[in-house]
Structure formats: structure tokens, C-alpha cells
């Protein structure tokens, strides 16, 4: 299968679903990760132009650890919002390029505007990409595929309906997260937390819920034509 995970910033995917994506790669899937924005505002000291480059390199380093292709949509932080046609059209192109069998993205009820905007943009673009007469970079329309919403930060207001056992992938998940060195500093200085420890603890918590040592939780987008009778997550 082909899997597309779309996050707002570099590191969002590592936090919420990198264990699942690593497991997808292990079973033979092609996995593509897209960061819609550059993450250029996510630091206390490093200026945006410099941070943009740093975070792109951190994301590619993390993806390489698991054999994942990493691309960026090219927007900066807080430039993405849910009625932004430019952003929607860019995601249409990315979805057509990736040709996924399912998509993973943010939960629509999340803690910051870039996350909620991306959730809506992915919902809109995944349908728009299926329209043969909608003008875009790629001629062939995409398939209409299921969307899975990944966990929110610290699991706030998120009740999973599906779980993936990532016990064998937890060390890789944390290693991928730790590639984002700028964000470990940012979260410590901005939010006062040990980011890697928090993410591992949340994975442990989801594991308790489903009888695994470590797990990641998901909720499928339940709308007309996006349902499936198959288990797609690994």
C-alpha cells in the first residue's frame, strides 16, 4: 500500500504516528510524509529564516531513519488556514503525487491553529483531488481514500477507535523525534517539558488502553464514501 501522512510542522508526525509509519514500511508500504508549514516560528532564539532550513534538515534526517520520503508544502507557520485556496491546491497536488491508499493527518479538534487548519485542508483537498475537471499539476484524479486522524498532543480530547501496537518501534520513534533537536529545546524553554519523555509516556498510556506495551491511537474520519471494511493500519 501507499501511505501519506500530512502534518502541520516538522515533528508533528514523529510525535503522533511515526511508530505506525515505521511499521507500515516494515510490511512493505511506501510511506510519504508531508509537512505543510516549515516550522520557522518554533524557537525562542533561532531566527525564522535560519530555523526554516534547520527544521527541513531535521525532518529529512528523521524520515531517513525509517525509510520514509519527506516533502514540504512550502508554507510558513501561521500562513495556513482552512479557506486558503493556495494551500488546498498545493495539497491536491501532493495527494495526487503520493497516490495514497489512506491518509493520516491531525485531528480537527487540536490545540493550535496550524493543526486544525491542516485537518480541514486535508479533508477538503482529499475530495477535491478526485475531481477529474479540477485543474491541478497532475492530470489523473486521485482515489477517494479513508482518512485517519492521529492523536492530539498529550491525547487531550482524543478518544481513539483504532490502535497500533508500536512496542517494537518505540525506540525508533523516539530516535526519530530526537532528530528534531531544535524542538526539544523549544518545548523545554516554551512549555517547560521534556518532550521525548512526554511522547514516550503518551505512547505507554495508549498501550495500556489496548493491551500493548506502547501504542499509537487513531480515529477514522466517518463520512460518506470514506469508510472501509478493511483494516488498513498495520
Where in the sequence are the language-model features?
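Active-site rim/loop-helix segments in enzyme catalytic domains that contact anionic ligands
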Residues: 1-98, 219, 231
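Metal-dependent de-N-acetylase/amidase catalytic core
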Residues: 1-4, 82-234
Amino acid at each position: 500500500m501507499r501511505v501519506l501522512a500530512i502534518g502541520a510542522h516538522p515533528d508533528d508526525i514523529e510525535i503522533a504516528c511515526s511508530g505506525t509509519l515505521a511499521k507500515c514500511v516494515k510490511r512493505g508500504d511506501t510511506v510519504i510524509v508531508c509537512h505543510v508549514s516549515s516550522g520557522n516560528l518554533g524557537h525562542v532564539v533561532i531566527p525564522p529564516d535560519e530555523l526554516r532550513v534547520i527544521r527541513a534538515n531535521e525532518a529529512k534526517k528523521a524520515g531517513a531513519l525509517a525509510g520514509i520520503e519527506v516533502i514540504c508544502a512550502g508554507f510558513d507557520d501561521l500562513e495556513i488556514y482552512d479557506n486558503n485556496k493556495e494551500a488546498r491546491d498545493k495539497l491536491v497536488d501532493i495527494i495526487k503525487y503520493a497516490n495514497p491508499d489512506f491518509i493520516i493527518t491531525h485531528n480537527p479538534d487540536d490545540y493550535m491553529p496550524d493543526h486544525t487548519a491542516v485537518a480541514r485542508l486535508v479533508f477538503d483537498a482529499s475530495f477535491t483531488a478526485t475531481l477529474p475537471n479540477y485543474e491541478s499539476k497532475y492530470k489523473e484524479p486521485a482515489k477517494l481514500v479513508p482518512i485517519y486522524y492521529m492523536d492530539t498532543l498529550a491525547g487531550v480530547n482524543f478518544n481513539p477507535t483504532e490502535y497500533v501496537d508500536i512496542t517494537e518501534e518505540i525506540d525508533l520513534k523516539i530516535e526519530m523525534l530526537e532528530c528534531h533537536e531544535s524542538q526539544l529545546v523549544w518545548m523545554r524553554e516554551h512549555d517547560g517539558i521534556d518532550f521525548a519523555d512526554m511522547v514516550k509516556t503518551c505512547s505507554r498510556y495508549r498501550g495500556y488502553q489496548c493491551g500493548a506495551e506502547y501504542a499509537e491511537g487513531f480515529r477514522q474520519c466517518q463520512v460518506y464514501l470514506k469508510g472501509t471494511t478493511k483494516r488498513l493500519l498495520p
